[in-house]
């Protein structure tokens, strides 16, 4: 199995390094990751400037000023030959639950892989300690995929409780919950008296009931949520069409 491994925490982050070490025990792994933390970069792609790369002695590649999406784009189309069999993103330091997936560079890297037609996993740890647990879970899933491919055409967003492996209760297939909208802005002044702004933490849990990714992780289970690239709200198409006709906009041209 050939794995393109990326993340949004940066090439030296403990999550990606722990996962790379574990994956290399049974797979051919190419790390292509940002040279710094790009958390919250979502699906941003660098189009107005060139990208430089640096290759470390162990073969890991850092994309200087690159986003997670840049890294997977370059990895698939230029840096990994032959091309990968699967794209894996993570292990993220902290969860990507509910609305987090909209902003997450970790999920975006997996989404870019899926966009190119590859199976893709996004892996996050609900904390900053037990990366070995998340790595073991990921390896188990990938070994299973080797034996029996999962032909859903979907991204698997995997969130792992920050627990020792022997305390993980199992795996649940979940849906995304939701958070309350975040509204905290933290102002500061620089030495010249100019105001600086920091975006605050994410909103608290809103929909975290049974069946959600929040609930599974809170209860000690690994959460796996299938995600899709197509954002079309198919069930709303007829509603929008009927509304356009009823207000007369749909018949103006």
UniProtKB/Swiss-Prot annotation:
UniProt-annotated binding residues for a divalent metal cation: 8-9, 39, 92
Keyword annotations from UniProtKB, A to Z: Cytoplasm, Hydrolase, Metal-binding, Nucleotide-binding
Enzyme class: hydrolase
One cellular component term from this protein's GO annotations in UniProt: cytoplasm
Reactions this protein catalyses: a ribonucleoside 5'-phosphate + H2O = a ribonucleoside + phosphate; a ribonucleoside 3'-phosphate + H2O = a ribonucleoside + phosphate; [phosphate](n) + H2O = [phosphate](n-1) + phosphate + H(+)
Compartment annotation: Cytoplasm
The protein's required cofactors: a divalent metal cation
GO MF annotation list: 3'-nucleotidase activity; 5'-nucleotidase activity; exopolyphosphatase activity; metal ion binding; nucleotide binding
Chief localisation class: cytoplasm
InterPro entries: SurE, SurE-like_Pase/nucleotidase, SurE-like_sf
Taxonomy, superkingdom: Bacteria
Enzyme Commission code: 3.1.3.5, 3.1.3.6, 3.6.1.11
Free-text comment on the cofactor: Binds 1 divalent metal cation per subunit.
Family to which the UniProt record says this protein belongs: Belongs to the SurE nucleotidase family.
Function statement: Nucleotidase with a broad substrate specificity as it can dephosphorylate various ribo- and deoxyribonucleoside 5'-monophosphates and ribonucleoside 3'-monophosphates with highest affinity to 3'-AMP. Also hydrolyzes polyphosphate (exopolyphosphatase activity) with the preference for short-chain-length substrates (P20-25). Might be involved in the regulation of dNTP and NTP pools, and in the turnover of 3'-mononucleotides produced by numerous intracellular RNases (T1, T2, and F) during the degradation of various RNAs.
PANTHER family reported for this sequence: 5'-NUCLEOTIDASE SURE, 5'_3'-NUCLEOTIDASE SURE
Name of this chain's protein: 5'/3'-nucleotidase SurE
Species of origin: Shigella dysenteriae serotype 1 (strain Sd197)
